[in-house]
Every structure is written in structure tokens, then in C-alpha cells.
Amino acid sequence: MFDDIWRQFRKQRLGLIGGGILCMLLLVALLAPVLAPYDPLAQDLYKRLQPPSIDHWFGTDDFGRDILSRIVYGSRISLRIGLIAISLALTGGTLFGLVAGYRGGMVDMLIMRLMDLMLAFPSILLAIAIVAVIGPGIENAILAVSIVLVPQFARLVRSSVLTVREATYVEAARALGATESRLLFYSILPNCTAPLIVQTTLGMGTAILDAAGLSFLGMGAQPPVPEWGAMLSGGRELLLRAPWVMTFPGLAIFTVVLGLNLFGDGLRDALDPKTT
């Protein structure tokens, strides 16, 4: 099975490019202390707002901090935010979807109407509202982003459960006395694995983008943390004088989100039964 999936995935050139971008992000995050030429928090007011040069490839910001070093260390923060947020969303959405699809009736209606209500708002607006209630900070931003991504997973899992809950093998397991939890997690959930993998990859891009948006608005990571969205926020008043302060963090966000989307699309096509 995995050989078939890998064979199909290798045909997805854009998916391979996306995978390469993700591998590069992972390596940069892991090797940040080695790759970063300077301390990301070190200030040198004598070198403030220097354009890209041999000494500072991406230039310096208004505190004289090396932008390349801050972007390199920022990859760790963005990766952590994306992984934690998508893991929480995956767990919560899967549980809601399993219960809604298996129980049906009033339980299904209540859960799905709640999901529909959340989906009625753009994810970033809902995340802003949540952070406005619980307060700013990276941890609260992660929680807010994970909450707004729950409906995507819940609807996906519910639709898969509705497809297989009356399948012969599920009925056989039920007849043999399998408990409800065993039916859900051992008989039904494995059939949701492929679409969940794809949604997790695509959702992680949304998580990183929304978290960067919160930091840009001052509701996520707080200075002097080298988070890409916070770096964008710090450079918005310098756009005309020192455009590199915003340009390189913006390119970092764009590249990572693009890589996740390309990789997710490649996985989706590789896992499509019509191609495998």
C-alpha cells in the first residue's frame, strides 16, 4: 500500500517541491543555532536599518538585529505553533466528528450546527475574537487557532463515519460485542486516515498563517520574540525606508504556506483511490 502511495506521490512534481520546502524548514529549525550567524535578540544600534550586505544577508531591523538570524530562529516558533495547533484541532475535530456521525439524531444536529456557526466566520476573525477574550500571547494564539480549525476536521470525519458506520465489517464487530469506543477507534476511524492526513497538512499552513496574522496585530507573539508575524508588524512603519525588514519575513511565511499547500495537494492526489 505504502509503495503504491509513494509511487503515485513521486508523479506529483509540485507535491515533491512542497515536500522539499518542508524538509528545508525542518532542517533550518533543527539547525538554527548552527545556521544563524548572530544572536536573534542581540541589538546593535550602530548597525540599525542596514540594507542586505555581506555581513547581514537580509539586512538589519530598527534595533540593529540581524534579520536572517531572526528568520532562522523564527522557523522554530512557526513550526511549533503549526504542529501544536493542528494537533489540538485534529484531536478535537476527530472526536466531535466521530460522535456526531456515529450517534446521529439530536447529538449530530447540535454538534454540526455549532461547527456551521464557527465556519460562518473567517478563521482569522474568529481567532481574533477568541484572543480578545483570553488575552494575547503565543500560547493563547495557538489555542485560538486550534479552535477555529476544529470544524474542518469535524465535518471531514463525520462524512467518513456516515459512509462506513453501516458497513458489513462494522456490523460484524458490533454483533461480536465490540464496545462503542472500540467500534469508533478501531473499526471506523482507520477509514478516515487518508483524508485526515491531507487535511492536517493543509490545515497546518492555515494555522501558521493565522498565527502570523495574530502576531502582526499584536495579539500573538510579543516583541522581542523572533516570530515572523511579529517581525512583519515591527517593520510596517519602515516599509518605504527599509523594505527588507518586512519583505524577508513575508517571504518566509509565503514559502512555508506554499510548501504545505503543494505537499497537501500532492498527498491528496496520491491517496486518491482512482489513482492508486
Residue ranges of predicted features:
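Gly/Trp-centered helix-boundary motif
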Residues: 1-94, 98-99, 105-106, 110, ...
